[in-house]
């Protein structure tokens, strides 16, 4: 697993985790400046931090109170390392508490937007207005600053909203600069990274590739690596990166379960197998999957069948390869968000992180996860740096069960063909309209509804196709995309005229929540 300690040749700022829901945003903001950042446990010791040699440390926010018996704290030697520290919300309170100040429950809790007033010539607020909007989320506040600090910011309900000790380069803010609602939050974080910590912004995908290739070669040696290739962005980027690092020591298994989008299997083989030279074993399992799904209409049962069948197929092929070629490593497209969402001791688990496809735990492979320090947008940037085509790098998110959950009810080959053809038209027209980078996800779905229509001089009784298109930042919430009417009309006309057995198109204008993005 790549971690911040491995990145010895780049500047880095570490974030110590105290459980804030915004932790991921802090690391993202710092990386946007070209400075590598990673979230580490608050239990990380001063000695471990000394070995990492960061340019700066950020204490995150968190839900606890510093005066609670079981409150999260840190190794006090961290304050003696001579490394600049920025405390955010709980982080500012913890620094104050540790260094001799006082923290107490607030008479009026602050949640949401507040007006911050800057006092004097504060380092982190250079070049920003004396009054600015910030995002507060706290129930406690600093009532007495620690020795060596001065108050540099205040708000109506938080008299001590920002502090600094310029000599030791310790800073604290009661608000959340990482949240977009703090209008000059990015400026503050940039001042900390560049002016206080002295970073130059040397983090890039180019040097990530160099470091990761070297690390993979050292880890793998002359052994063989197996990768489950789905055709999605993450596994494709992993494949190309591994190919660059170890060449023909990599073998990819691509399971075509018959539930892929139009032309997807061919594109994977032509692009990844052709241009990039990946050694891909394609397993044609269409009949196997469709026979297992025959007569099944319950969505959860469909998901379970597809997931289990994928495991069986992959396991069969992996076992063969392990015996024949002595495969030692299994590569996965795990992202940094997967690692974070697995939960830590400071936060509730959002979702369990499993290996790809729920592969059997008794498979005797050592894991390689070269993307597990990267966010999704960084993975796309990495793919571009590796020379991968936009058609793969900017591919739409696609669920593991594939079109199996975009055909509502029982799955048949005829229904799958309707979804494939209509979805291909939708993607073509969205791209032609220049909307493919603006809409977060878009696809067609077959609800299983048939209705009366008229085509030519005859009556029809054919299927309805639904179009789902949403805008989102992180997928947790989403709004339906405002696609121009003329584009929707063109899509509708083409689908009805070009896709057999379709006579009606509907557009889903439901947000998430209450609906989910997928229909099943």
Swiss-Prot record:
Question: What HAMAP family has UniProt attached to this entry?
Answer: GMP_synthase
Name the keywords, alphabetized: ATP-binding, Glutamine amidotransferase, GMP biosynthesis, Ligase, Nucleotide-binding, Purine biosynthesis
Name the positions where ATP binds: 230-236
Q: How does it assemble?
A: Homodimer.
Concerning CDD domains, the annotation shows: GATase1_GMP_Synthase (cd01742), GMP_synthase_C (cd01997)
What lineage is this protein's organism placed in? Bacteria, Bacillati, Bacillota, Bacilli, Lactobacillales
> Which organism was this protein described from?
Enterococcus faecalis (strain ATCC 700802 / V583)
State the SUPFAM superfamilies in the record: Adenine nucleotide alpha hydrolases-like, Class I glutamine amidotransferase-like
* Name of protein: GMP synthase [glutamine-hydrolyzing]
- Gene3D superfamilies, per database record: 3.30.300.10, 3.40.50.880, HUPs
């Amino acid at each position: 697993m790549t971690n911040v300690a491995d990145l010895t040749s780049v500047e880095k700022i570490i974030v110590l985790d105290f459980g804030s829901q915004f932790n991921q945003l802090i690391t993202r903001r710092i990386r946007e400046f070209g400075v590598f950042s990673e979230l580490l446990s608050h239990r990380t010791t001063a000695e471990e931090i000394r070995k990492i040699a960061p340019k700066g440390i950020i204490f995150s926010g968190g839900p606890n109170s510093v005066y609670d018996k079981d409150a999260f704290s840190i190794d006090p030697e961290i304050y003696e390392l001579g490394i600049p520290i920025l405390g955010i919300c709980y982080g500012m309170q913890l620094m104050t508490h540790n260094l001799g100040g006082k923290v107490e429950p607030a008479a009026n809790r602050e949640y949401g937007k507040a007006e911050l007033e800057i006092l004097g010539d504060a380092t982190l607020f250079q070049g920003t207005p004396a009054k600015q909007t910030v995002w507060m989320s706290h129930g406690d506040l600093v009532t007495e600053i620690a020795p060596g600090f001065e108050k540099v910011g205040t708000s109506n309900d938080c008299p001590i909203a920002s502090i600094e000790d310029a000599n030791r380069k310790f800073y604290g803010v009661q608000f959340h600069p990482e949240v977009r609602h703090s209008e000059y939050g990015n400026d503050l974080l940039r001042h900390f990274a560049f002016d206080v910590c002295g970073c130059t912004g040397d983090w890039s995908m180019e040097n990530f590739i160099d470091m990761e290739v070297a690390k993979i070669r050292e880890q793998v040696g002359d052994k063989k690596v197996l990768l489950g290739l789905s055709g999605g962005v993450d596994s494709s980027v992993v494949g190309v990166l591994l190919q660059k690092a170890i060449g023909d020591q990599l073998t990819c298994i691509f399971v075509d379960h018959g539930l892929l989008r139009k032309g997807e299997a061919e594109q994977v083989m032509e692009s990844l197998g052709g241009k990039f030279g990946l050694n891909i074993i394609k397993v044609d399992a269409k009949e196997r999957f469709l026979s297992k799904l025959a007569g099944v209409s319950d969505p959860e049962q469909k998901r379970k069948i597809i997931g289990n069948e994928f495991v069986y197929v992959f396991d069969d092929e992996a076992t063969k390869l392990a015996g024949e070629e002595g495969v030692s490593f299994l590569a996965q497209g795990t992202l940094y968000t997967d690692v974070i969402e697995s939960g830590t001791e400071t936060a509730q688990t959002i979702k369990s992180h499993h290996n790809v496809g729920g592969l059997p735990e008794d498979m005797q492979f050592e894991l390689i996860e070269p993307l597990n320090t990267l966010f999704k947008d960084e993975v796309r940037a990495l793919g571009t740096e590796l020379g991968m085509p936009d058609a793969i790098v900017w591919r739409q998110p696609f669920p593991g069960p594939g079109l199996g959950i975009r055909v509502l009810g029982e799955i048949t080959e005829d229904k799958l063909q309707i979804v494939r053809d209509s979805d291909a038209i939708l993607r073509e027209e969205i791209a032609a309209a220049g909307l493919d980078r603006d809409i977060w996800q878009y696809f067609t779905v077959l609800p299983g509804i048939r209705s009366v229509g008229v085509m030519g001089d005859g009556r029809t009784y054919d299927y309805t196709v639904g179009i789902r298109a949403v805008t989102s930042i992180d997928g947790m919430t989403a709004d339906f995309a405002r696609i121009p009417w003329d584009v929707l009309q063109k899509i509708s006309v083409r689908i009805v005229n070009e896709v057999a057995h379709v006579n009606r198109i509907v557009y889903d204008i439901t947000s998430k929540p209450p609906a989910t993005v997928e229909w099943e």
